[in-house]
């Protein structure tokens, strides 16, 4: 299995999985994808169903990873997934249970049973194990430079804290996270964790990460890697839970006609991009529903064909803050597939048109015309009032308390349900404890606090303020990161 950049030219070399694991962004500014997607046949899915039932989620995940990873021994891969997906790190032994939402014709895939109560744990726990394994094998070290709108940061830091050969520099938008999210990150005082509050919004943080990655000399000197969803291994981990979701919703003997559709609360397009990849592999997913909040860049594209990232000033602060993103970094992967995997055409859009015009328009193309039939995508939006109403309604009618992002998903799911046949699953993003103020506003009461989080907002915190400057960030890395630690 070899990997290619979305901006590849005719002479761009392919890479191995272990190389791109540590590298993150490709040297040409593109994102890595497999040269070809492996396929999942009906018999493959039957075998994975047996493995999931008899051996558990970790063993099933190892089976899927083995389709993409041929430079890590199969026995080692099984051990890696067994360490990543275990209790008590995950509070439910099923890791990803799927339940019917009472009183509706919807299902919920529960992705937030990990150590930080967010779906990001599903990828980060695996990424931490993969990083440590590969760095130990190479005798190397890595400086992770990442950006978070709320959940990625804490998930990454909990997965990477105290790991050999790893330092973490995590950028957050100052004042844009909930008190719980800030406490989860800033109360980690481990010597290999550096929390940074940037004077800007999430997209500014993400741009700083890209600027660091595009400085080849600095990146090489400081061994810079990525945990944001620009890292292919993140998406690969997420592909696994879409397979598990399909297996848990369908019955024994299900075949390619047994379509399951999913609704994915979306900001950076990573989660739903994993659904797209699983669908390309042959997993019988029907419609892929992109649910956005008021920062509706993705919804605009799927409705109109125009991709128009917003400026920092135009990115709204909402009550589903982890989706307050107006430059979807993973979107390039999908556009690469949409354009027939043409690296030159993809580069022309993302490196040239966006820089020159601030948008690109595919509305008149045959690719956009066939978007739903070929790739299954539709979209919808949700507002503050919508998510408050959905949180209150779902608690009253179903006895289930949603976090604001999952509420966006359920709101959109109800709106599109008449268009979709067969099971429809909303992919949960987090537990409501992370968004207490919004839950209180919606329901009149605070969310329950799991025992492991009691008192977290009263702990000592450490964070470094930073101007929105790549040079200032480089100076901070030089000052705070211990090479080889």
At which residue positions do the language-model features occur?
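PLP-dependent amino-acid enzyme catalytic core
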Residues: 1-485
